[in-house]
Amino acid sequence: MTKLFIPYIMGNKDLIENATLLSENGADIIEIGVPFSDPVADGPVIMEAGQQAIKQGITIDYIFNQLEKHGDQIKCNYVLMTYYNIICHYGEQAFFEKCRDTGVYGLIIPDLPYELSQRLKQQFSHYGVKIISLVAMTTDDKRIKDIVSHAEGFIYTVTMNATTGQNGAFHPELKRKIESIKAIANVPVVAGFGIRTPQHVADIKEVADGIVIGSEIVKRFKSNTREEIIRYLQSIQQTLNN
């Protein structure tokens, strides 16, 4: 099975241009961050990118508008990474309806309690927008079974107990945990948080069905040339599927 490559970008003025570049260079699914004033799950790089986007006037409406107009330029699935507060403020039903209308494949909602995710799935499944389950390394086995049994799209295993994009030191129990999740899962199990280099990818791909790279991609879009970004994406893609 081909391993999934899921890069993250912040929703900003360059959203469509950046997402198109990623989709043309090996991305299977793109995670689009919705800027939020209190992003509890984000590391410093993504937090700063979010603050910049807010200063640019980026809102969820702007992101929906761009996806509605130009989403067909993105040649792969895309998901929104957003906080529940934004969904609640927008109105749950209106939010899911808009996701469907703008081609959003799924939602990653890091502050969403499991019980609330179940209600949203039951209430809004007819919109066809998947709610992606997150599993932390600290989650106990019983809760993992509950989460996995209702998972859709893919399962996002959080490979560090720290916030995103830190030193890339993987939890010692990580591989065992991912293997135990895969044994009972009916959807791909991907690893994210702290993956930056081809070496990290080579290490984690032994067990995971794919990887998410966030902070490193955001950093490179800020400081690298288009050619440098493409070279980096190719190095990740080659390592992932070698």
Curated annotation (Swiss-Prot):
Keyword Lyase attached: yes
The keyword S-adenosyl-L-methionine is annotated on this UniProt entry: no
Cellular component, GO annotation: cytosol
Catalytic site positions: 31 (proton acceptor), 42 (proton acceptor)
Catalytic activity: (1S,2R)-1-C-(indol-3-yl)glycerol 3-phosphate + L-serine = D-glyceraldehyde 3-phosphate + L-tryptophan + H2O
Single annotated GO MF: tryptophan synthase activity
Range of residues in the leader sequence: none
Keywords: Amino-acid biosynthesis, Aromatic amino acid biosynthesis, Lyase, Tryptophan biosynthesis
Top-level EC class as recorded in UniProt: lyase
Entry EC no(s): 4.2.1.20
Pathway annotation: Amino-acid biosynthesis; L-tryptophan biosynthesis; L-tryptophan from chorismate: step 5/5
Residue spans crossing the bilayer: none
Family statement drawn from the similarity comment of this UniProt entry: Belongs to the TrpA family.
Subunit comment: Tetramer of two alpha and two beta chains.
Functional summary from the UniProt entry: The alpha subunit is responsible for the aldol cleavage of indoleglycerol phosphate to indole and glyceraldehyde 3-phosphate.
Protein name: Tryptophan synthase alpha chain
Annotated source species: Staphylococcus aureus (strain JH9)
Gene: trpA
